[in-house]
Design a protein with these regions (language model features):
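Beta-strand-loop-alpha "switch" segments that mediate conformational coupling across diverse proteins
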Residues: 173-178
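N-terminal beta1-alpha1-beta2 submodule of the flavodoxin-like/Rossmannoid cofactor-binding fold
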Residues: 1-114, 180-219
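Short, glycine-/small-residue-rich phosphate/pyrophosphate-handling segment
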Residues: 97, 110-172
């Protein structure tokens, strides 16, 4: 089973480093791992056109019709069995690119709505929705901020949790890595790197479990 690490931060910097540390530990626990930095992807905002829901209601698969790079990340998330997500916080909340993805991915893949639609399709003998929509996935969140005080990154983790909320991912760990401006590089903080590794271990140990059996570890 595969753990996907997603970094919305600068290439080679704190978000990347902490995500990869989590992935290294997940791999040591026996999981396959994949890493993607999405900073160069063009992920535009949702236009509320309703096409994704309309396609679903017409018996088709869920699809966003905007022509950008959203689909690259969407497919990687759907293929994964567990997620480690990291994003920088510059002004209280995570970067807008993450929110753009959440706004398009979350409502389109809402598990409650998709469960209802899948039951309808079964009863009417229609083409079923993609089975990947219904995976139970563990996820761990890493909020990365340069601010010295926690209040300047206070909405980092809460907003990041929206990534997995409507699709029913289970949070199995989180890390609020603020004050990174003075730390300079996470590898200089042994305790921080250990906590990042613990997230990867938690995700790996919860792979393949039903949501009610997944356990939370960390802060």
């Amino acid at each position: 089973m595969k753990v996907l690490g997603i970094s919305f931060g600068r290439k080679g910097h704190c978000s990347d480093i902490l995500t990869k540390e989590a992935l290294f530990e997940a791999k040591r626990c026996g999981a396959d791992v994949e890493f993607i930095n999405v900073i160069d992807l063009n992920i535009g905002h949702c236009t509320a056109c309703g096409a994704c829901g309309a396609a679903r209601d017409r018996g088709k698969q869920v699809k966003c019709y905007r022509k950008d790079d959203y689909h690259i990340l969407e497919e990687k998330v759907l293929d994964a069995d567990g997620i480690v997500l990291a994003a920088p916080v510059y002004a209280v909340a995570p970067v807008g690119q993450l929110k753009n993805f959440i706004d398009r991915f979350g409502p389109a893949h809402d598990r409650a709505a998709l469960n209802k639609e899948q039951e309808r399709r079964k009863k009417e003998g229609m083409e079923l929705l993609d089975a990947r929509y219904f995976k139970d996935r563990p996820i761990a969140y890493i909020s990365v901020g340069g601010a010295i005080t926690q209040n300047w990154v206070s909405m980092g983790l809460p907003i990041m949790h929206l990534f997995g909320m409507s699709v029913k991912m289970k949070s199995v760990g989180r890390l609020d890595a603020y004050d990174m401006g003075r730390t300079a590089n996470p590898v200089l903080d042994e305790k921080l790197m250990s906590r990042a590794a613990a997230l990867g271990r938690s995700v790996a140990q919860n792979l393949g479990k039903p949501l009610e059996e997944m356990t939370f570890a960390g802060d």
